[in-house]
Structures are given as structure tokens and as C-alpha cells.
UniProtKB/Swiss-Prot annotation:
Top-level lineage group: Bacteria
UniProt source species: Sulfurimonas denitrificans (strain ATCC 33889 / DSM 1251)
GO CC, any one term: cytosolic small ribosomal subunit
Gene3D superfamilies referenced in this protein's UniProt entry, alphabetically: 3.30.70.60
Keyword Hydrolase applies: no
Keywords: Ribonucleoprotein, Ribosomal protein, RNA-binding, rRNA-binding
Protein name as catalogued: Small ribosomal subunit protein bS6
Family designation: Belongs to the bacterial ribosomal protein bS6 family.
Entry's Gene Ontology BP terms: translation
GO molecular function terms attached to this record: small ribosomal subunit rRNA binding; structural constituent of ribosome
Length: 137
């Protein structure tokens, strides 16, 4: 079995329940073809670089999984049939370097999934001393 990553963009006009149902259907497609889902990363609603049809935004979701290479054509065929998906891309990780990168991505996605929503990292903004002096005047 090889390691793969799928980025799918779901239509923004769907409700949260419909989006979740579509993501569950996508995961079912993968598992029904013998795949094992390693991690998933919901990236949320994002602005697209260019409009796809009449959509300027989309719900991005990444799925990391392992599956037999012969099943990829069927998985992609089922993705093409789904009218709720704006776009999808499948990335194959097969060299040792790529597999190492895939493992790191999976670990990062799993860590993000287990982190409570309230504990999101907040970066501290550092104001240079020169700017602080200007503000005081």
C-alpha cells in the first residue's frame, strides 16, 4: 500500500451538516476501496485564488491515507461524480524522502486534531522599541 494525500474543496453554499456529510462520504469512498485513513485536517473556509464557476470561496479538507495503487482510479472517478466538490487533488508519496514528509504531515494533522479548540496558538506581537517611542510622542 502507498501513502496518499487528498485535498478536496467543497462548495461554500452547503450547510455545516452537508459539508460534514460530504467529507464522511469521501472517507467512506476511501475505506470502501481498501484504504486506511491516517489523519484528516479540516482547513476551513478559504478564499480561492480565482473563481471556480460562481464560487469565490470553498471549504478545504485534507485527508491522509494509505491504499493500494490500483484503487486510486476508482477513488478519483467517484470524486469526479460528486457534484458538491469544486476541486480535488491527489498527491502520491512513494520515495523514502516523500514518505518521511508524509509521516510528518500526518503527525502534525493528528496533533492539530487532538488540540482543544480553545488552546489555539496565539503568537505574541513584538513592537520594536523605535515604534514604541514614536507612539508616545
Amino acid at each position: 500500500m502507498r501513502n496518499y494525500e487528498n485535498l478536496v474543496i467543497v462548495k461554500p453554499t452547503l450547510t455545516a451538516e452537508e459539508i460534514q456529510a460530504n467529507i464522511s462520504a469521501i472517507e467512506e469512498i476511501i475505506t470502501s476501496n481498501g484504504g486506511e485513513i491516517a489523519a484528516r485536517d479540516a482547513m476551513g473556509m478559504r478564499k480561492l485564488a480565482y473563481p471556480l464557476g460562481k464560487n469565490e470561496r470553498g471549504y478545504f479538507h485534507v485527508i491522509y491515507y494509505s491504499v493500494d495503487p490500483s484503487a486510486i482510479s476508482e477513488i478519483e472517478r467517484r470524486f469526479r461524480i460528486n457534484e458538491e466538490l469544486l476541486r480535488f487533488v491527489t498527491i502520491k508519496y512513494d520515495t523514502n524522502r516523500e514518505v518521511t514528509a508524509w509521516n510528518q504531515l500526518v503527525q502534525k494533522a493528528q496533533k492539530k486534531a487532538t488540540q482543544p479548540a480553545g488552546e489555539a496558538k496565539v503568537e505574541e506581537v513584538v513592537i520594536p522599541a523605535a515604534l514604541e517611542e514614536d507612539e508616545e510622542e
